[in-house]
UniProtKB/Swiss-Prot annotation:
Top-level taxon in the UniProt lineage: Eukaryota
InterPro entries reported for this sequence: Zar1, ZAR1/RTP1-5-like_Znf-3CxxC
Keyword Metal-binding: yes
GO molecular function: mRNA binding; zinc ion binding
First and last residues of each zinc finger (3CxxC-type): 222-305
Family per record: Belongs to the ZAR1 family.
Region annotated Disordered, chain positions: 106-130, 155-208
Entry text on domains: Disordered regions undergo liquid-liquid phase separation (LLPS) for the formation of membraneless compartments that store maternal mRNAs in oocytes. The 3CxxC-type mediates binding to the 3'-UTR of mRNAs.
Protein's recorded name: Zygote arrest protein 1
Known function: mRNA-binding protein required for maternal mRNA storage, translation and degradation during oocyte maturation. Probably promotes formation of some phase-separated membraneless compartment that stores maternal mRNAs in oocytes: acts by undergoing liquid-liquid phase separation upon binding to maternal mRNAs. Binds to the 3'-UTR of maternal mRNAs, inhibiting their translation.
């Protein structure tokens, strides 16, 4: 081999053919490990596939908004929390349109296989409304309480009431039509009016008795007096939760010694005894009940760690 300045020239020349060029990776040893910052974040191919999918979706949406890439099976790594689409459709997480579309397809297929009786209205998924949670002390709550009423007996239309109340009169009327002719047909609407009005008023009276009941009840804060006979201990508390408009106590309180639960033997509104106001407006301030500062601070330690503790102030509370 020729030499240049007494040095071999082999080290300066390389073969024009590299067997490891192209897409085939070079052979590595068994103990070799590629170190990269992307190794801590899962498979890089998955990340690139998601990026390519997003780019493809944006390109297709620019061409035609109806064109979207084929939906693949949802991956739990990308999705995080999944809920049951059949039961919890109202609280669907942002997992894409696949689950809801599948539910709609199943509903359409079931409706086609099992059509209802003729004349029944078909409900759509878009008509379902889920009311928001409202606070007790919010002014919106008292205005929209009627929206949570469940109607047990809905008002029936006059046509249905006539059909139910007058089933036996139809053959008699038919016989009268055959006998009397057109004159009786002209007088029939006048005879039906008072009967239909009586039937409608009777149905309204029955429906008004058990018309509706509230789905959940609001709670209000009151003042209560407690007495434990075993420990011979009395205490007062301004954290007595009662059903709104009544003295029905919903949560019991515990004695600080024996830890037994008790209902108050007396409950009163959190107001001044003289002016009957929540904020006392008397010239000489008498005993006033403040919800945030009960009278006996030494007795409030009995409720620590309980569900309703005096340490925390609740802005609202309701029973579902």
């Amino acid at each position: 081999m020729a030499t240049y300045c007494d040095e071999p020239v082999d080290s300066y020349f390389y073969s024009s053919y590299n067997p490891y060029m192209g897409r085939y990776p070079r052979h590595r040893d068994a103990g070799w490990k590629y170190k990269s910052y992307l190794s801590h974040y899962g498979d890089t191919s998955e990340a690139f596939s998601n990026q390519q999918r997003a780019q493809l979706k944006s390109i297709l949406s620019q061409i035609n908004p109806k064109l979207t890439p084929r939906l693949r099976k949802a991956n739990t790594k990308d999705v995080a929390v999944q809920v049951n689409p059949k039961r919890d459709a109202s609280v669907q997480c942002s997992i894409g349109p696949r689950t809801l579309l599948v539910v709609k397809r199943e509903l359409r297929r079931r409706r086609k296989l099992n059509p209802g009786p003729p004349g029944t209205p078909q409900k759509t998924e878009g008509e379902v409304r889920y009311p928001r949670t409202l606070a007790v002390y919010s002014p919106i709550a008292f205005r929209s309480v009627t929206s949570f009423l469940v109607e047990t007996g809905k008002d029936r239309p006059a046509a249905e009431a006539q059909a139910e109340e007058l089933p036996g009169e139809q053959p008699e009327q038919k016989g009268g039509e055959n006998q009397a002719g057109e004159e009786t047909n002209a007088n029939l609407p006048e005879q039906r009016k008072p009967q239909s009005e009586d039937a409608q008023t009777a149905a309204d009276a029955e429906g008004s008795k058990g018309k509706a009941r509230v789905r959940f009840q609001f709670l209000e804060q009151k003042y209560g007096y407690y007495h434990c006979r075993e420990c011979n201990l009395r205490w007062e508390s301004a954290y007595v939760w009662c059903v709104q408009g009544t003295n029905k106590v919903y949560f019991k309180q515990f004695c600080r010694k024996c830890q037994k639960d008790f209902n108050p033997y007396r409950v009163e509104d959190i107001t001044c005894h003289v002016c009957n106001k929540a904020r006392c407006a008397c010239a000489e301030t008498q005993r006033h009940v403040d919800p945030k500062r009960p009278h006996r601070q030494d007795l409030c330690g009995r409720c620590k760690g309980k569900r309703l503790s005096c340490d925390s102030t609740f802005s609202f509370k309701y029973i579902v």
